[in-house]
């Protein structure tokens, strides 16, 4: 919900898992949000980052590493097309 000035006033904003598109509920204490920094050709941080959210289910199954790798490969392909 937003106030008259357009600022978000909610305490909880629901998120979706980037790997499975499942809703991350407020009681999912095993979920994580990762900010992965972008690097230039010299390996220096450019100030930009990409955010991925992983639900506890993905982490409990042991698929977090492969999920992040798959998401990052997809992100790199999208960046090359632009």
Curated annotation (Swiss-Prot):
Listed Gene3D superfamilies: 3.30.1230.20
Superkingdom of the source species: Eukaryota
MF (Gene Ontology): structural constituent of ribosome
InterPro entries: Ribosomal_eS21, Ribosomal_eS21_CS, Ribosomal_eS21_sf
Modified residues (N-acetylmethionine): 1
GO cellular component, one term: cytosol
Transmembrane region(s): none
GO biological process: chloroplast organization; translation
Keywords assigned: Acetylation, Ribonucleoprotein, Ribosomal protein
Similarity comment: family membership: Belongs to the eukaryotic ribosomal protein eS21 family.
Name this protein carries in UniProt: Small ribosomal subunit protein eS21z
Species of provenance: Arabidopsis thaliana (Mouse-ear cress)
Species classification: Eukaryota, Viridiplantae, Streptophyta, Embryophyta, Tracheophyta
